[in-house]
């Protein structure tokens, strides 16, 4: 079952009974779901005006469902209803924000990537040490033969 969270913002100029009625009508579309949590935040001041309104009722529903058509129906009814100022539906199973740090598949994938990057870094450092040792040996040979010695180029990634 997929986990979802819905936030519903209802007009603040309605009285509480009307706002609850609007929210309950929309919640009724989620009939075959396991509602885990209902939060009613009451009338709150909006950060900015929406349709010339400064206050709104906020409802948050957390639930689980396998039927995506219920989510689509909820979205359709929320858009049609003029008393709903805003709504957002979030699939909590997907990796948004901090959820990516909790998702075991993503955590395992990131750990594997970190291991690969650590091995690549160790290999690059080992090759750099080998290059430095080869340079020192070449330098000693050339000095013994009386030939000029070139400077060691540390950045071997640059194209010459």
From Swiss-Prot:
Keywords for this entry? Ribonucleoprotein, Ribosomal protein, RNA-binding, rRNA-binding
Cysteine-cysteine disulfides: none
Protein's recorded name:
Small ribosomal subunit protein bS6
A GO biological-process term = translation
Q: Could you cite one Gene Ontology molecular function of this protein?
A: rRNA binding
Extract the InterPro entries matched here. Answer: Ribosomal_bS6 (IPR000529), Ribosomal_bS6_sf (IPR035980), Ribosomal_S6_plastid/chlpt (IPR020814), Transl_elong_EF1B/ribsomal_bS6 (IPR014717)
General function of this protein: Binds together with bS18 to 16S ribosomal RNA.
Tell me which HAMAP family the record gives.
Ribosomal_bS6
Q: Where is the signal peptide?
A: none
**GO cellular component term, pick one:** ribonucleoprotein complex
Entry's family note: Belongs to the bacterial ribosomal protein bS6 family.
Q: Which NCBIfam families match?
A: S6 (TIGR00166)
């Amino acid at each position: 079952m997929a986990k979802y969270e819905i936030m519903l913002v209802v007009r603040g100029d309605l009285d509480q009974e009307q706002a609850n009625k609007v929210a309950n009508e929309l919640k009724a579309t989620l009939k075959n779901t396991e509602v885990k949590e209902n939060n009613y935040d009451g009338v709150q001041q909006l950060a900015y005006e929406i349709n010339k309104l400064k206050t709104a009722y906020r409802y948050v529903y957390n639930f689980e469902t396998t039927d995506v058509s219920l989510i689509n129906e909820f979205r359709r009814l929320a858009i049609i209803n003029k008393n709903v100022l805003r709504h957002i539906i979030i699939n909590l199973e997907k990796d948004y924000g901090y959820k990516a740090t909790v998702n075991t598949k993503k955590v395992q994938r990131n750990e594997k990537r970190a291991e690969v990057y650590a091995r690549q870094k160790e290999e690059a450092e080992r090759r750099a040490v080998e290059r430095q040792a080869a340079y020192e040996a070449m330098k000693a040979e050339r000095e013994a033969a009386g030939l000029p010695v070139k400077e060691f180029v540390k950045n071997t990634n640059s194209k010459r």
